[in-house]
Curated annotation (Swiss-Prot):
Single GO molecular function: hydrolase activity
Superkingdom assignment: Bacteria
Alphabetic keyword roster: Hydrolase
Cross-referenced InterPro entries: Metallo-B-lactamas (IPR001279), RibonucZ/Hydroxyglut_hydro (IPR036866), UPF0173 (IPR022877), UPF0173_UPF0282_UlaG_hydrolase (IPR050114)
Family affiliation: Belongs to the UPF0173 family.
Coiled-coil annotated residue ranges, if any: none
Organism: Geobacillus sp. (strain WCH70)
Gene3D superfamilies: Ribonuclease Z/Hydroxyacylglutathione hydrolase-like
Name of protein: UPF0173 metal-dependent hydrolase GWCH70_2696
Leader sequence residues: none
Pfam families, A to Z: Lactamase_B_3
Length: 226
């Protein structure tokens, strides 16, 4: 399995012959190394309905005939746009042919802002536990620190955790360091920072808060082989 960071909260997983994207925000994402026309996706996993996470999902899904896995309300909304979806909800897991997906809690919002200045409610935000080839990845989505991260860490052997550190909209570095301790992940990668001025952070300062060897700053396009 190979896991690659592509800026902001975009993560690509390559496993079992499939290419899986989490939160493919590419157009308008100054932090990514990707070009939309070059992206191939078999599966798209979404944590919540904000534009900087749904991103280019509809276009990518239609172009690649990709399956979109998302919380129920968000999946329903995307299904109305002609996207092939699999709805899930927090606490639920499903075994697909490419791996197992389970949604966890996240403390955030999930409204989509339309061009005519309407906000569409798209259910609860989520984190994602993805397991394949005997490895488990946790993508926290956008979230503040919450105590059930201890439970997630106790019940799952997490190989890589992607945690937001940008503050303002999500955890900042200090809270994310506590999350890393509770989750017990072997590797922790900071995400959701420096895309916009309001979430400017130094990821190396975050890594310095973690035990030696745990934190890993990935530049867009850099990956980890598991």
């Amino acid at each position: 399995m190979k896991v690659t960071y592509h800026g902001h909260s975009v993560v690509k997983i390559e496993t079992n012959g499939k290419t899986i994207f989490i939160d493919p925000f590419i157009t308008g994402n100054g932090a990514t190394d990707l070009k939309l026309e070059d992206v191939k996706a078999d599966v798209i996993l979404l944590t919540h309905g904000h534009g900087d996470h749904v991103g280019d999902t509809v276009q990518l899904a239609k172009k690649n005939n990709a399956l979109v896995i998302a919380p129920f309300e968000l999946a329903t909304y995307l299904g109305w746009q002609g996207v092939n979806t699999h709805p899930m909800h927090i606490g639920g897991a499903h075994q697909f042919d490419f791996g197992k997906v389970k949604l966890t809690q996240a403390f955030h919002g999930s409204g989509y802002v339309t061009e005519d200045k309407q906000i569409i409610y798209l259910g609860m935000p989520a984190g994602i536990l993805f397991t394949a080839e005997g490895k488990t990845i946790y993508h926290a989505g956008d979230t503040g620190l919450f105590s059930d991260m201890k439970l997630i860490g106790e019940r799952n052997s997490i190989d890589v955790a992607f945690l937001p550190i940008g503050d303002n909209f999500t955890m900042g570095p200090e809270d994310a360091a506590v999350a890393a301790e509770w989750l017990r992940a072997k590797i922790v990668v900071p995400i959701h920072y420096n895309t916009f001025p309001v979430i400017a952070q130094d990821p190396h300062q975050f890594v310095a808060l973690l035990p030696d060897g745990v934190g890993r700053v990935l530049k867009p396009g850099e990956g980890i082989e598991l």
